[in-house]
Amino acid sequence: MLKKLKDYRRIVVKIGSALLVDRATGLKRKWLESLGQDIAALQHAGVEVLVVSSGAIALGRTVLGLPKKALKLEESQAAAAAGQIALAKAYADVLGGHGIKSGQILVTLSDTEERRRYLNARATIETLLKLKAVPIINENDTVATTEIRYGDNDRLAARVATMMGADLLILLSDIDGLYTAPPHKNPDAQFLPFVETITPQIEAMAGAAASELSRGGMKTKLDAGKIANAAGTAMIITSGTRFGPLSAIDRGERATLFEAAHAPVNAWKTWISGNLEPAGRLTVDAGAVKALKSGKSLLPAGVKEVDGDFERGDTVAVMNEDGREIARGLIAYDAADARKVAGHKSDEISAILGYDARAAMIHRNDLVVRAASDAKAA
């Protein structure tokens, strides 16, 4: 059974091009206004909402008067350039009507695949959320090439959801969920309200639902589900064609829930602790050990020694003074800067480095404290 959306902590909403843009008239303003009302209601209830929005190319086609036929790469990128401006303005106007600020973030594949760029992208989005702004995220279609693109915003939305530790991803589309077969082709197709695991049998049910306005079909949505569920994020596929598409979920309108097996934070920290070899080591004092065990970030003041040659965003092991690993995490400094600020208070860092740096050497969200039985000698 679906929970109420207000019971989630952080939700990523992906919006398909066909929902936002009409080929003849352009932006579907009334629909977008109804979405804005839903987002405002969720934010008022304490839920953080991020939007991954398609529509830049589709909207840019209408802005530039491009033909309905398939576009060349350079035409698509020109359409994206024009459409991104119009799309950002539309979101700013609609959300602004509810007293909500928004910020546009254009990403490429490497922004969520390369650790340092990943950390930068995540820090920017986190800051927007702390400022009560709604991040409006899209692939940077003006510069992305075939070799370095997501190819669809379903998978981009899943990457954003896992990067940000969201507990729910909602894919709004012109399809109201998953069926045992494409319902427009098979009248006997049965609707599936709940999917526990995306198996090969489930994947075989996907049909091609992409249109000339969008690149994603059901297959890409199931791919997104695998990414999200593996990282601890639940996913909902539902129709966005009705007004108030998010509140419609709470009203019981048809939707398919793909449930995650574990919590997002656990999945993220499992990735840190289990899948990455540390590129360096930090030796910390007893006060820092106590702080880490109580769930706090690692500050430079508690670091006594820095070993290794690492870059910002690399994984490092945190050792106590007896040489035992007590934690592991993603470091916010490269090795040279870490050595400079080790042992210093956070308010001294900017003067030492000559630029405004992060206060924590390892933020608690990027830190896994090992249980006593897991700690091992260096």
Swiss-Prot record:
Belongs to the glutamate 5-kinase family. Substrate binds at residues 54, 141, 153. Catalyzes the transfer of a phosphate group to glutamate to form L-glutamate 5-phosphate. InterPro entries: AceGlu_kinase-like_sf (IPR036393), Asp/Glu/Uridylate_kinase (IPR001048), G5K_ProB (IPR041739), Glu/AcGlu_kinase (IPR001057), Glu_5kinase (IPR011529), Glu_5kinase/COase_Synthase (IPR005715), Glutamate_5-kinase_CS (IPR019797), PUA (IPR002478). It is found in: Cytoplasm. GO terms for molecular function: ATP binding; glutamate 5-kinase activity; RNA binding. This is Glutamate 5-kinase. Residues 279-356 form the PUA domain. It comes from Brucella abortus (strain 2308). ATP binds at residues 14, 173-174. It comes from the Bacteria.
